[in-house]
A protein has these predicted regions:
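Acidic/histidine-enriched segments that form metal/cofactor-coordinating
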Residues: 49-153
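His/Glu-rich zincin catalytic helix
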Residues: 1-55, 70, 80, 151-172
Length: 172
């Protein structure tokens, strides 16, 4: 969609795929999404972040798709980086460990939140533990997820053949 009012471009990527069943390994969605968008097999996380920051661009990816925003003059390069990160993510053990530690810290913080406890209890009672809405990750389930699990999860659910991309902004 062309819109030349401002010199910027936005891209949204959405995947049309079957629902994700996390009941076997709760936390896969979260950990895989946390590892996406931070570089690729060809561009280190540090170089990726430095380049997108230098251009003032935003690149955000999850297992569901993602989005990116940039000034028009940087759009071709930002789109290259977005595609590179989406199609060739670099899942490393160090990044998996960081994401896992972050999730566990969040779980521990939620232990004292009445709102979080009520939400989990209500969902579990309403849907049951075999339903995706009634299943939650735990410290144990997070610790059981391996780098191979994350890679296989990505390969199963992130497919360009099922992707829709919308580009809006100062483009021809």
């Amino acid at each position: 969609v062309e819109d030349h009012k401002l010199p910027r471009v936005s891209v949204s990527l959405t995947l049309d795929r079957p629902p994700i069943d996390e009941t076997q390994k709760p936390g896969m969605y979260y950990l895989t999404s946390e590892l996406m968008g931070g570089g690729s097999k060809n561009i280190s996380k540090e170089a990726f972040v430095e380049e997108t920051d230098r251009m003032g661009a935003t690149v955000y990816l999850t297992i569901d798709g993602g989005n990116t925003y940039s000034l028009t003059r940087y759009f071709p390069r930002v789109l290259e980086l977005f595609a590179e990160a989406a199609l060739h993510p670099n899942f490393t053990q160090a990044e998996l460990d960081k994401a896992r530690d972050k999730a566990i810290a969040s779980l521990k913080a939620e232990e004292n939140s009445a709102q979080s406890i009520i939400y989990r209890l209500n969902s579990a009672l309403t849907y049951g533990k075999k339903h995706p809405y009634g299943s939650f990750y735990t410290e144990e389930s997070l610790k059981s997820i391996t780098l191979s699990d994350v890679s296989n999860f990505y390969k199963t659910y992130f497919s360009p053949a099922n992707a829709y991309m919308v580009v809006v902004g100062d483009v021809n």
